[in-house]
UniProtKB/Swiss-Prot annotation:
Keywords: Isomerase, tRNA processing
Subunit structure: Homodimer.
UniProt record similarity statement: Belongs to the tRNA pseudouridine synthase TruA family.
Keyword Isomerase: yes
GO molecular function, one term: RNA binding
Domain of life: Bacteria
Annotated residues for binding of substrate: Y110
Name of protein: tRNA pseudouridine synthase A
Length: 260
């Protein structure tokens, strides 16, 4: 048995998320289909993050279990990558132990991109367009209310019937303008739950616009209303999984994929 850790990137706009589904096109489904096309057998995969429909990734980590040893592993991985649709790419790979836990991460970093400038036709799939200029400093100040350990039940898509923990820690949030003058809201933490970052982002914007107060946000964190969630949830296409880090250094092999 051979265990590999892949780093993959994808444009998630046209996909129904990471997790494989019977009647929908997903990233995991396309990856396993590509492996099957090369190996002619089902290959088991597990992603570090279950990105939602429409969400992108620059560094999704995927654990792959092979029941055989390819003679030229780098060539094999590159062939699989070339078999994938053009909006999914394998960036690199590394051998890992059988007991490696792909979801036991040290930190995940997501970034949500907002365009408060002129409409950008060629990047509209990767950003949320707003019609008025925003103050980065004010957005950053509002965002800090969510830093730390809180019960995020009100700011996540968790159903009352689901047994999912909602108390988690966000280590850091920061807001900046990138080189293209777009606004980026960065979220760094170990665990994020369904829709959490999108809901936090839209609540930051709602607070900025005066639709909800900081006092209300604080109350919803300290004592979340039972069985209810916020009505504010940002569009998925502005969100990207930027990076995943583990407790120990995992050095992925990028060179061989490039030079072969």
């Amino acid at each position: 048995m051979l265990y590999l850790l892949l780093s993959i990137e994808y444009d998630g706009y046209d996909y129904s998320g990471w997790v494989k589904q019977k009647n929908a096109r997903t990233i995991q489904g396309e990856l396993e289909k590509a492996f099957f096309g090369i190996c002619h057998q089902k290959i088991w995969t597990l992603g570090a993050s279950k990105t939602d429909a429409g969400v992108h990734a620059c560094d999704q980590k995927v654990l792959v279990k092979l029941t055989f040893q390819p003679r030229h592993l780098a060539f094999f991985i590159k062939t699989v990558s070339q078999t994938l649709p053009p909006n999914i790419n394998i960036k690199g790979y590394q051998f890992v132990a059988e007991n490696f836990s792909v979801r036991t991460v040290k930190v995940k970093e997501y970034v949500y991109t907002i365009n408060d400038q002129e409409y950008d036709l060629f990047n509209h799939r990767y950003e949320l367009k707003v019609n008025a200029p925003l103050n980065v400093k004010k957005l950053h100040q509002i965002s800090q209310i969510f830093v730390g350990t809180h019960d995020f039940a009100y700011f996540a898509g968790v159903k009352p019937t689901e047994d999912i923990a909602t108390v988690h820690t966000i280590n850091k949030i920061w807001v900046k303008r990138n080189k293209a003058k777009k606004i980026e809201i960065h979220f760094r933490g170990k665990i994020f739950i369904r829709y959490q970052i999108r809901m936090l982002t839209q609540n930051i914007l709602a607070c900025y616009a005066g639709k909800v107060s900081l006092t209300e946000l604080q109350a919803q964190l300290n004592c979340p209303p039972k069985g209810t969630t916020t009505k504010y949830c940002a569009k998925p296409y502005g969100l990207c999984l930027k990076k995943i880090k583990y407790l120990y250094t995992v050095k992925l092999n990028y060179k061989k994929l490039i030079i072969l």
